[in-house]
Amino acid sequence: MRDVLGQIDTISNAMETPGDKMGEFEQMQTILHAAPPRLLPILAIGAFSGIRVAELNRLDWSAVDLDRRIIEIRAGQAKTASRRVVPITDNLAAWLEPLERQGRVVPAKQAHRDVAALSAALGIAWPRNVLRHSFISYRIAVVKSADQVALEAGNSPAIIFKHYRELTTEDQADKWFAILPKEGQSGNTFLVDKRTGKVVMNGKRLR
């Protein structure tokens, strides 16, 4: 059977090149704090583990081990066709722990469109692969090892060193990996009228 969920990343992953990262940690915090629970896996896992869209679309919650603090990207899910293990940071664990974790992490491709609609409604730019690029840039500022980040991201050390080193400071990276859920986070709602394109968040029309 053809993988329908995987089709959404055809353009973004056909030629994965380094691009824009999220400009400020406040922007990521804003969109995470506004997101309903169903969009949090895409946002939090993308921002704090750097998993590719294609890999995320094929990921099952059984591969997310909060006790061991790892996400297993199996060979059939990875772009490079080789298994890798991605660490779960403390703040990513805080985002994932309250969620219902059964079945596919991304159950429908509509979730990606809703993330784009949410960012647009909040006035936040959403370049292609922005979460992955942001993660790699901030992660290398923390661990200071292109080899380690390459293993985690499923990329080559040469690419990491050439394109992502010194794009951000350690202080900025520390703020990125300190973004945590806010009180009442689970009550967020977000709807997009498919006919009119109007966005309603927490009962209020945004646009």
For each predicted feature, which ranges?
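Catalytic-site neighborhood detector that most strongly recognizes the C-terminal catalytic loop/helix
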Residues: M22, I73-T80, A93, A146, ...
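Short coil/turn motifs that cap or connect alpha-helices
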Residues: R52, D60-S62, S156
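Short, basic (Lys/Arg/His-rich) helix/loop patches that form interaction surfaces
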Residues: L32-L40, S49, V86, A94-A108, ...
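General beta-strand recognition
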Residues: D9, I70-E72
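C-terminal secondary-structure termini that scaffold catalytic or DNA-interacting sites
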Residues: R68, D90-L92, P98-Q102, I159-K162, ...
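Well-ordered beta-strand positions in beta-sheet-rich domains
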Residues: I70, R83-V85
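Basic, Lys/Arg- and aromatic-enriched nucleic-acid-binding interface segment
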Residues: D3-V53, N57, A78-K79, R207
